[in-house]
Amino acid sequence: MSFSPLIRQLIDALRTLPGVGQKTAQRMALQLLERDRSGGTRLAQALSQAMEGVGHCRQCRTLTEDDLCPQCADTRRDDTLLCVVEGPMDVYAVEQTGFRGRYFVLKGHLSPLDGLGPEAIGIPQLMARIEEAGTFTEVILATNPTVEGEATAHYIAQLLQNKGLIASRIAHGVPLGGELELVDGGTLAHSFAGRKPISL
C-alpha cells in the first residue's frame, strides 16, 4: 500500500521511537488519523511543548522543566552520597529504591567503537560537579551491568581513587524472587563473585 506524503511523514516520525517498527508505526498513524484525531492533536501539542520546554538540570543533567530538577532542589537530601547513572530513566528507577542522595546523569556509557569517550558522556562535568560540591564522600556507580557500563564504572572509579573518594558499585545478580534455573550463566557467575557473608 502506498501512503500519501503526509501519512508517510507521520509514519517515519513515529518510527523514531524506540521499539517502533514499520508496521507498528503504520498502525499508530492510521489509528490517530481514523479513530482518534483529538488524541493525535493532544499528542502533537504535548510533544511540541515538551521539546520546547524540557531541558537539563544544571546540576545533575536529568530532564526537567526548571533550572534544577526536584531532586537537586530538595534541601533534605544526603549531600554526602552521589549516584552516577547512564540516563534520566535510571534516576526514576533509583528513586523507587528510596535513595535520598544526589545524582549525576551521564549521556550513556563509554563506547570507543561508537566514538563515545569520556568527554562525550560528560565525565569531565561529573568530576567538576564533585569538586564544586565538596561534600561527597561516596560515589555510587549505578551504570548498567553491560561490558560498556562496567568499563565506564571502572574508568570513573580510577578517577575517584585519585581524589580519595569511596567509589562503590551497585550489586548485580539474581533478582529478588527469581529462580536460579531461569538466570543466565553470566548473571549467576557475577552473583557468586559478589557473594557476601550472612550477618546474624
From Swiss-Prot:
GO terms for biological process: DNA recombination; DNA repair. The keyword DNA repair applies. Keywords: DNA damage, DNA recombination, DNA repair, Metal-binding, Zinc, Zinc-finger. Residues 80-175 form the Toprim domain. A zinc finger (C4-type) spans 57-72. CDD domains: TOPRIM_recR. InterPro entries: DNA_Rcmb_RecR (IPR000093), Rcmb_RecR (IPR023627), Rcmb_RecR_Znf (IPR015967), TOPRIM_dom (IPR006171), TOPRIM_RecR (IPR034137). SUPFAM superfamilies: Recombination protein RecR. Pfam families: RecR_C (PF21175), RecR_HhH (PF21176), RecR_ZnF (PF02132), Toprim_4 (PF13662). Transmembrane segments: none annotated. This is Recombination protein RecR. It comes from Pseudomonas fluorescens (strain Pf0-1). The lineage of its organism: Bacteria, Pseudomonadati, Pseudomonadota, Gammaproteobacteria, Pseudomonadales.
